[in-house]
From Swiss-Prot:
Disulfide bonds: 28-39, 280-304, 388-389, 580-606, 582-625
Gene name linked to the record: TLR4
Intracellular or extracellular location(s): Cell membrane; Early endosome; Cell projection, Ruffle
Name the record gives this protein: Toll-like receptor 4
Glycan attachment sites: 34, 115, 172, 204, 237, 307, 492, 495, 524, 572, 622
Organism listed in the record: Cricetulus griseus
């Protein structure tokens, strides 16, 4: 029974644990440590208990909270942003937000709130931004926010509001800057609706009324009203309604007026000049007109807008824009995506900023006269310039900002004469011609920003950037250099702080390229073909903070890693084919040690060897190299030892045989008195002199001679050792010129040395048969040294010399010989008998 009971308990526990949702255990994601938590869409029906009191940003959106009880967030006194979007909240009890004194942003979007009592928003002493979009709000009166005196932005868009009447409590909201009433059901605007604003002229309110179906504005409704911004987009269902309503804006003072429609909300079929004429009684500082399909040809009469400081036309279909009077006080003109067929010939003495972008119909730049112009943006038009760039080409002497990016072919024929005030210059994604034929930027000593990225420029002239002594930002990505080598083109740009040379097909970097860029903070060399990370190139970049070498062909580094500038904070080496081999062990270990300093080390993968392909560089283990080094070291040492032994065995094979023989014959008696080593060229002397005087003399000596005593059929070397050395007491070495030149003689002599060492007594007798030149004798170093230090016999072919020679030789041979008196007497008698008979 017990096992069954345990099994049932285990199954019940498993079922219980499986029924728990993961989010119920740890429902929120910690975005920033103890300050930001994301609990979106976790099926929560209450505030989680495990959120710390230090939280500042809390996202509870898309959870079925249903109800917010009193003091729901009392535990989060540091909270600054609270997102309760689409939490199905129907009821918010009084003091629900009590204790949130630091809260600045509250988002209630998409909650079907049934009732908002006076105490709903109590406790929000510092609230600045309230988002109450799509909460089924019927009127502004039902929103109890009169006490939120710190409120700056109120967004009640997409509700059920029909009346534009601003409640009296707005007079308390003295800090309110933006009111968004867009996408409601406001149809009419009356004079009394704005009475609160008239009574509180200190308000500087921006009012968003777009997407309300306005069909009537009471004449004079905006009389005496001053606004920072008024936006009316896609409000009118016909041209006539729009004209009437615009005319009834008379008396309004507004800093910025925005009219028009949205891209996907087009109601007005055609715009004519009467729409613009309705603005003559409105005081406007800036005017923007957006998204208009059809414009009458006579709408170019902008006299009612002559005194605005900024004029903007965006996505307005204009066939032409010309004949703008000189007296217009426009300081800014922006024409954006208006499909103009040609650039307007402008002559506006007050104009300071001209933005003419993405108008694909205008392909050339006409003559203009804009003496006050400081900002010119002509990007994205597809224009071509046959000659550029000087004052006569652009009609402006005071230019500080020039943007010619995303255009066609720009032929550089002049070096910006008359444009010496330029501080910003952008050519990116236009095609530059003749850019490297001369120092085209030479007069631009004040230029701070230059972008020639993707201009099809091949840089083969080191003086291209001469004159740019103040430049701090240089972007030249997507171009190329001669022979794909980064040359010394930055010697004059000593104030650079930002340099982008990515996608330039670079394979090498010349020495000293960056040596003058001591202020450089960011260097982008990504998407090139560099093979090595050569640290010496960056040694002089004392201010460098960011280096991007990603997407190259870098396998390892070159140089000492400490040569990196100490100021460097971010290094990106991702997407390089690293070689994770022991040869690069130091670099790979450095990557591990600097993982916090390197960008996205988890994306740094190995390309080689095959077994580590696509594995992380961080997974490389140094222990593998130590094992391999140990194996290699042991293998090398073993091979060396075996080779040495083999060599020694080969070289001293006969010496070893001699040693073995010495052990074998050490206890036996010698057969011969001496083994004679000599050259075959000296054999006559050996037979006629040496043998005759020693073997036939008194006392007689028995010599071992190879021609007489060696055993036939046995190897010469074996005979030398076994018959010569092992069976002889002494060794006689007959030294001559022939002896020194004979390899066999030298071999026999070396064996004799070993034999003498093993026998532990002086057993070698040297006979110098003839005078031998020292130079020849020195070829055999050991023999020369031995003859220099030891006594030897020298053959002299005269009576006295012979007598002394034979006496000394016999005495040497008798040394160590066992004495036999009878044998000696018999030998002496035999010698006397022989003499008598003769």
């Amino acid at each position: 029974m017990m096992p069954s009971f345990c099994l049932a308990g285990t199954l019940m526990m498993a079922l219980f644990l499986s029924s728990l949702r993961p989010e119920s255990l740890d429902p929120c994601v910690e975005v920033d440590s103890n300050t930001s938590y994301q609990c979106m869409d976790r099926n929560l029906n209450k505030i989680p208990d495990n959120i710390p009191s230090s939280v500042k940003h809390l996202d509870l959106s898309f959870n079925p909270l249903k109800t917010l009880g009193s003091h729901s967030f009392f535990n989060f006194p540091e909270l600054k942003l609270l997102d309760l979007s689409r939490c199905e909240i129907e009821t918010i009890e009084d003091k629900a937000y009590q204790g949130l004194h630091q809260l600045t942003t509250l988002i209630l979007t998409g909650n079907p709130i049934q009732n908002l009592s006076k105490g709903t928003f109590s406790g929000l002493a510092n609230l600045q931004n309230l988002v109450a979009v799509e909460i089924k709000l019927a009127s502004l009166d039902s929103l109890p926010i009169g006490h939120l005196v710190t409120l700056k932005k109120l967004n009640v868009a997409h509700n059920l509001i029909h009346s534009f009447k601003l409640p009296e409590y707005f007079s308390n909201l003295t800090n309110l800057e933006h009111l968004d009433l867009s996408n409601n059901y406001i149809q009419t605007i009356y004079y009394t609706d704005l009475q609160t604003l008239r009574e509180n002229p200190q308000l500087n309110l921006s009012l968003e009324l777009s997407l309300n179906p306005i069909d009537f504005i009471q004449p004079g409704a905006f009389q005496g009203i001053r606004l920072h911004e008024l936006t009316l987009r896609s409000n009118f269902n016909s041209t006539n309604v729009m004209k009437t309503c615009i005319h009834n804006l008379d008396g309004l003072q507004v800093h910025r007026l925005i009219l028009g429609e949205f891209k996907n909300e087009r109601n007005v079929e055609r715009f004519d000049r009467y729409v613009i004429e309705g603005l003559c009684k409105v005081t406007i500082e800036e005017f923007r007109f957006t998204y208009a399909n059809e414009f009458s040809e006579d709408i170019t009469d902008f006299d009612c807008l002559a005194n605005v400081s900024a004029m903007s036309l965006a996505n307005v279909y204009l066939k032409r824009l010309e004949d703008i009077p000189k007296y217009f006080k426009w300081q800014t003109l922006a024409v954006i995506r208006c499909e103009l067929k040609q650039f307007p010939p402008l002559e506006l003495p007050f104009l300071k900023r001209l933005i003419f972008i993405t108008n694909k119909g205008a392909t050339s730049f006409p003559e203009v006269n804009l003496p006050s112009l400081t900002f010119l943006d002509l990007s994205g038009n597809g224009m071509s310039f046959r000659g550029c760039c000087s004052y006569t080409d652009l009609g402006a002497r005071s230019l500080k900002h020039l943007d010619l990016s995303f255009n066609g072919v720009i032929s550089m024929s002049e070096n910006f004469m008359g444009l010496e005030q330029l501080e910003y210059l952008d050519f990116q994604h236009s095609t530059l011609k003749k850019a490297t034929e001369f120092s085209m930027f030479l007069p631009l000593e004040k230029l701070l920003y230059l972008d020639i990225s993707y201009t099809n420029t091949k840089i083969d002239f080191n003086g291209i950037f001469f004159g740019l002594t103040s430049l701090n930002t240089l972007k030249m990505a997507g171009n190329s250099f001669k022979d794909n080598i980064l040359s010394n083109v930055f010697t004059n740009t000593t104030n650079l702080t930002f340099l982008d040379i990515s996608k330039c097909q670079l394979q090498q970097v010349s020495w000293g390229v960056f040596d003058t860029l001591h202020r450089l903070e960011l260097l982008n060399m990504s998407h090139n073909n560099l093979l090595l990370l050569d640290l010496f190139h960056y040694k002089q970049l004392h201010s460098l903070k960011t280096l991007d070498c990603s997407f190259n062909h870098i396998e390892t580094s070159k140089g000492i890693m400490q040569h990196f500038p100490k100021s460097l904070a971010f290094l990106n080496l991702t997407n390089n084919p690293f070689a994770c081999i022991c040869e690069h062990q130091n670099f790979l270990q450095w990557v591990k040690d600097q993982r916090l300093f390197l960008v996205k080390t988890e994306q740094m993968t190995c390309a080689t060897p095959v077994e580590m392909k696509d594995s992380l560089v961080l997974d490389f283990r140094n222990a593998t190299c130590y094992v391999q080094k140990t194996i290699i070291s042991v293998s090398v040492i073993s091979v060396l030892v075996v080779s040495t032994i083999a060599f020694l065995v080969y070289k001293f094979y006969f010496h070893l045989i001699l040693i073995a023989g010495c052990k074998k014959y050490s206890r036996g008696e010698s057969i011969y008195d001496a083994f004679v080593i000599y050259s075959s060229q000296d054999e006559d002397w050996v037979r006629n002199e040496l043998v005759k005087n020693l073997e036939e003399g008194v006392p007689p000596f028995q010599l071992c001679l190879h021609y007489r005593d060696f055993i036939p059929g046995v190897a010469i070397a074996a005979n030398i050792i076994q018959e010569g050395f092992h069976k002889s007491r002494k060794v006689i070495v007959v030294v001559s010129r022939h002896f020194i030149q004979s390899r066999w003689c030298i071999f026999e002599y070396e064996i004799a040395q070993t034999w003498q060492f093993l026998s532990s007594h002086s057993g070698i007798i040297f006979i110098v048969l003839e005078k031998v030149e020292k130079s020849l004798l020195k070829q055999q170093v050991e023999l020369y040294r031995l003859l220099s230090r030891n006594t030897y016999l020298e053959w002299e072919d005269n009576a006295l010399g012979r007598h002394i020679f034979w006496r000394r030789l016999k005495k040497a041979l008798l040394d160590g010989r066992a004495w036999n008196p009878e044998g000696a007497t018999e030998a002496e008698n035999n010698q006397q008998e022989t003499t008598t008979s003769i």
